């Protein structure tokens, strides 16, 4: 969390105010924000956003993910479930945890988000890296722009097509 705390100045990050250890457990204290779940925000906007609305929300997120990876930290769970919107319309990223929770076949119970988890997260022999992050980011952006969550990564390995209506395709950048 100390490395994540170094990125407090990035608009998409929820500020970490303190980090401490007690009873062999690390804790972090975050700033209090009134947040709306991103999935609810999408529902209130007919299930999808236009590119002109989504772009300013997602650009700070891609910058933050790049900054995290430059410091050796991955989130590996970018999905509508880990995103929030502030009262003033800014996107916030939540859900940081150990990388072992973002992969099947590790000693910890995995926390994967169907449609946004990359294929390598289902196979313990693969390493998670920036490509894993890009998969989750683009799957979340696809969902945001089309209103449809991509198929689970295992299903997409069998059939990688992303079906969408002609009207949806015409709206995409």
Regions of interest found by a model, annotated:
Residues 1-6:
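AlphaC helix of the eukaryotic protein kinase fold
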Residues 19:
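Activation-segment/catalytic-loop signature of the eukaryotic protein kinase fold
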Residues 23-37:
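Conserved short submotifs of the Hanks-type protein kinase catalytic core
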Residues 38-49:
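AlphaC helix of the protein kinase catalytic domain
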Residues 57-58:
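Activation segment signature within eukaryotic-like protein kinase domains
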Residues 61-73:
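Protein kinase catalytic-loop region centered on the HRD/HxD motif
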Residues 82-95:
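Conserved protein kinase catalytic/activation segment
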Residues 115-173:
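C-terminal lobe helix-coil module of Hanks-type protein kinase domains
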């Amino acid at each position: 969390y100390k490395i994540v705390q170094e990125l407090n100045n990035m608009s998409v990050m929820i500020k970490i105010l303190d980090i401490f250890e007690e009873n062999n457990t690390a804790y972090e204290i975050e700033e209090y924000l009134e947040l709306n779940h991103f999935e609810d925000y999408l529902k209130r906007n007919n299930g999808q956003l236009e590119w002109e609305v989504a772009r300013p929300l997602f650009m700070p997120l891609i910058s933050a993910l790049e900054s995290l990876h430059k410091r050796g930290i991955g989130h590996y769970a970018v999905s509508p479930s880990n995103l929030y919107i502030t009262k003033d319309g800014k996107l916030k990223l939540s859900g940081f945890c150990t990388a072992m929770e973002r992969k099947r076949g590790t000693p910890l119970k995995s926390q994967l988000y169907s449609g946004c988890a990359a294929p390598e997260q289902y196979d313990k022999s693969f390493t998670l890296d920036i490509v894993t992050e890009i998969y989750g980011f683009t799957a979340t952006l696809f969902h945001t722009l089309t209103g449809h969550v991509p198929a689970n990564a295992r299903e997409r390995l069998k059939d990688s097509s992303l079906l969408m209506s002609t009207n949806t395709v015409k709206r995409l950048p």
